[in-house]
Amino acid sequence: ACSSNKDLMFGAGIAEYAIPISFKSHEKKIKNDSFNSIVYLNASKSLTQYSYGILMEKADRLMYVDYYTARDYYSESLDLFLKSRSYMVQALSLRHSDFESKMMKKESINFKIDDVPYLYWLSGSMAGSIQASQGDPEHLIDLTNIRWLLENAIVLDPNWEKGSLYAAMMSVYLNDLSGDQDSERKAL
């Protein structure tokens, strides 16, 4: 059992150094193919997964032991979440004209089932920004956008990635600031 833990720790160490190298590859692909929404999606996924899986994990573990180092990890992850958010807004804008404005106004968009990963990863980057900023109001205002994105995705494909959309939506309901007293019950 101990050896598998060491192997996992070793693998995590490799990922910590290898994944940021892939960011340069993603940026190059975006530069060379800036009208292809898939390159933005792939870059966003990498940024978000690295931020949650490596940086936020380290920050959370260090928060009460080495506050200033933890803050540095949160700050770095926030920067990556914001870049990921920007990539996903760009990707969805390529797929749906005036996407960002429509999202802010919660207007109807004719999303397709192929949009589900885009909606999910945009909501994930927004949620990550809230978490990494420790609830900074500048990012907290995205809670309604996260809910809107996930609700639209669930309508399209409720079983996507074995219920990942519902798992994400539970967090939204549990952090609902709208005053809806049934919000927690809806989540459960």
Predicted segments with their positions:
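Charged, well-structured binding/catalytic surfaces in domain cores that contact anionic ligands
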Residues: 160-161
